[in-house]
């Protein structure tokens, strides 16, 4: 009797229906999981990207704690959420999503520049950051626009400035961070290069996305190797010791071998970095990435290089 009542189990239509229903349920479950996890993944990616940016600017150390520059040196710091300021601390806590987000909101301004070195804000052009980054470089009044991340001075007055105010009068800028992108051995590489207010001296660099070989090319993301960039100059110094910001080579070269052994104290050494053993092609890609990515910023970097220490209005 039971066998007769279940005769349909072997019917083709039942098997097809069963597979369809099972697939529908599985698809619904997977979609639900993706819907729930997508915002979390996006938040994690944003945290990592912003963390890497601030590591390049030395605001966050390789130990994932805040740092603050005072009295001519970097000191371990904590982010005081009440005062919303960095304060020197002998036992700084690890950076969290909350503290990084608060610091970013108060002391990082996302600006725009063009090939003439003019600074502006997204609000000035009625542009949205997310849409801007997902589309080809927009052109306003015949000039392409490029992103600049401005790190502001660690004081209450600077934290209250809008992006438009900073763009019009950049005296509150402590350092700038530029997005760097190019191709390594196995695919695209994305990172940041942070420069001091002089527009020439490197604070640091970081790479937040790459597909290079672990133990070889992947060492571009190793903090120990990245320390080699500190203090380097993006504008090549001439043999006479002078720098022609309008014409000289702009970029950083990762050479094969050691800079001290290959270049000694020659002017080129100031813009060169020790290579990574066994990763020559990746290093060549990094060199090309700096050259290509920095080119549109020459006028802006020249402006900062020629600015007086006291600062001046960016209206030219």
Curated annotation (Swiss-Prot):
<keyword id="KW-1278">Translocase</keyword>
<keyword id="KW-0406">Ion transport</keyword>
<comment type="similarity">
    <text>Belongs to the NqrC family.</text>
</comment>
<protein>
    <recommendedName>
        <fullName>Na(+)-translocating NADH-quinone reductase subunit C</fullName>
        <ecNumber>7.2.1.1</ecNumber>
    </recommendedName>
</protein>
<keyword id="KW-0472">Membrane</keyword>
<keyword id="KW-0813">Transport</keyword>
<keyword id="KW-0288">FMN</keyword>
<feature type="transmembrane region" description="Helical">
    <location>
        <begin position="13"/>
        <end position="33"/>
    </location>
</feature>
<comment type="subunit">
    <text>Composed of six subunits; NqrA, NqrB, NqrC, NqrD, NqrE and NqrF.</text>
</comment>
<keyword id="KW-0520">NAD</keyword>
<dbReference type="GO" id="GO:0006814">
    <property type="term" value="P:sodium ion transport"/>
</dbReference>
<keyword id="KW-0285">Flavoprotein</keyword>
<dbReference type="InterPro" id="IPR007329">
    <property type="entry name" value="FMN-bd"/>
</dbReference>
<dbReference type="Pfam" id="PF04205">
    <property type="entry name" value="FMN_bind"/>
</dbReference>
<dbReference type="GO" id="GO:0016655">
    <property type="term" value="F:oxidoreductase activity, acting on NAD(P)H, quinone or similar compound as acceptor"/>
</dbReference>
<keyword id="KW-0739">Sodium transport</keyword>
<keyword id="KW-0915">Sodium</keyword>
<feature type="modified residue" description="FMN phosphoryl threonine">
    <location>
        <position position="280"/>
    </location>
</feature>
<keyword id="KW-1003">Cell membrane</keyword>
<comment type="function">
    <text>NQR complex catalyzes the reduction of ubiquinone-1 to ubiquinol by two successive reactions, coupled with the transport of Na(+) ions from the cytoplasm to the periplasm. NqrA to NqrE are probably involved in the second step, the conversion of ubisemiquinone to ubiquinol.</text>
</comment>
<dbReference type="InterPro" id="IPR010204">
    <property type="entry name" value="NqrC"/>
</dbReference>
<keyword id="KW-0597">Phosphoprotein</keyword>
<keyword id="KW-0812">Transmembrane</keyword>
<keyword id="KW-1133">Transmembrane helix</keyword>
<keyword id="KW-0997">Cell inner membrane</keyword>
<dbReference type="GO" id="GO:0010181">
    <property type="term" value="F:FMN binding"/>
</dbReference>
<keyword id="KW-0830">Ubiquinone</keyword>
<dbReference type="GO" id="GO:0005886">
    <property type="term" value="C:plasma membrane"/>
</dbReference>
